[in-house]
From Swiss-Prot:
GO cellular component: cytoplasm
Cytoplasm recorded as keyword: yes
Family annotation (InterPro entries): PCRF, Pep_chain_release_fac_I, Pep_chain_release_fac_I_sf, PrfB
Keywords, in A-Z order: Cytoplasm, Methylation, Protein biosynthesis
Protein's organism: Campylobacter jejuni (strain RM1221)
PTM notes: Methylated by PrmC. Methylation increases the termination efficiency of RF2.
Name used for this protein in its record: Peptide chain release factor 2
A Pfam family this chain is assigned to: PCRF
Gene Ontology MF terms: translation release factor activity, codon specific
Subcellular location: Cytoplasm
Family designation: Belongs to the prokaryotic/mitochondrial release factor family.
Protein function: Peptide chain release factor 2 directs the termination of translation in response to the peptide chain termination codons UGA and UAA.
Residues spanning the membrane: none
Amino acid sequence: MDNYEFSELLKTLKNKVGNIASIIKPENIQTRLKEIEELENSPSFWSDVKQAGVIGKEKTKITNLLKNYENAFNALNDASELFDLANSENDTETLEALFNDAPKLEDTITSLEISMLLSGENDGKNAIVSIHPGAGGTESNDWASILYRMYLRFCEREGFKVETLDFQEGEEAGLKDVSFLVKGENAYGYLKAENGIHRLVRTSPFDSAGRRHTSFSSVMVSPELDDDIEIEIEEKDIRIDYYRASGAGGQHVNKTESAVRITHFPTGIVVQCQNDRSQHKNKATAFKMLKSRLYELELMKQQDSANTGEKSEIGWGHQIRSYVLFPYQQVKDNRSGEAFSQVDNILDGDIKKMIEGVLISLKAE
């Protein structure tokens, strides 16, 4: 990097921070934080626990947003002032240090962008994720299990907690179906970018001739709904099936019909849950999953309407990403256009940067 490139980078980053400031309005956030502080000092504030919880979440979210903005603004100002000073004194050592720190400065601004992009109504919620293999039997089942492991590793890296809601093993390998709840700050905000069809190209370990195979799996992500969001489901629109749980569970397995499957006729959505020994609890969880999926479907419809009839790029039916393991190694996201060669790292859950690239590119559109 040289002086010209660094000065151009500073211009670009200042422009970004200026645009973000015009959207988030830091002065309005400060005013709102003062209002919340006054509310919290009122004796009656804590009598409504539910409302206090809602305001508490808002406070955490906007405090983090303001903190990220101030960090980015200060880091950029400091770098700009130091650059001018080092230039005027021809201080090559300081200039070299600034050039070396440029990626870190860009990361600080990206952090601000992401925190702005994850300030939507549902982004802070937990996420319900379901993975379904496409046609192709064992090969697709194996691909679904690779994706499942990728998300589990991602959750580990981010400190998210995972609770399995439903797991059905494949007959020879992999899995037929899995649903799990991801708990953590902005779990849905990040994972919503994974909604869609994931394509794998590789030489199949299940093909003795070693031919190249293409497999597909769909990933569906919806926000876990708070109890105060009401979704009406009519009895005539659903069918509830009870069946015996499969998979791990010791002697309890296959003895009682504790697993629950709900089919929603108008949309064709099917959800199932077998993570608890209690049929009653599994039924309650399955209804929660169905409500979340219906809510997500409604969000997509609204997004499509807002896009003047164009299809949203975050959707269950879109092919969003290709993972090519043969004849070359590359993961390419269809929405951001970014390609990555560190395939092993990505399949080991190192997907945060890739997801952030998607969120930024979708916002830019």
